[in-house]
Amino acid sequence: GNGRFIFAGYKTESAPFDAATGDYNGGAEAITQQVDTARNMTISHTGQQIFESITSNAEQLPGGGYGQTNMFKILDSAIASLKTPIENDPAAATAQSQVIANAQIGIKNSQNNVLTVVADVGTKMNELEKLDTLGDDRALGQTKQMSDLVDVDWNEAISSYTMQQAALQASYKAF
């Protein structure tokens, strides 16, 4: 690699997520690049767009709302809950069940968002392949035009020009 962080937007010199807390520290703007004369394309999504967002059709938690949307914090919450002893403690067992149920919904929502981003990346890759093919077609056309200009059969060109000039002179005399 080049030593730069992915998912950090334009802040590629530092880690996008805090390893201890899961907080996003990357840039807010995704990296864009010009891919054609009149087309700029997002070439890298931020970690915030991928791991801290949900889709518009996300499932709500049983009590309403969406709760935590940061995938890492959702997983940390589930892990911490599973580490809590619940033996002979019905209240702790109920609380753990609720945390795990909420985590399942949160992970499903996060996974749907990740799949949406993956689909977006696939669409952009498809567009880049089409732009590449279009560029190859243009290059071939320009090579043919250049060949037509450079590889002229001068005898044929002069003969054709002379015949066209004679036809033009004849049309002038007809009027």
Predicted regions located by residue number:
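Amphipathic alpha-helical coiled-coil/heptad-repeat segments
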Residues: G1-G63
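Amphipathic alpha-helical polymerization modules
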Residues: G1-T12, A80-F175
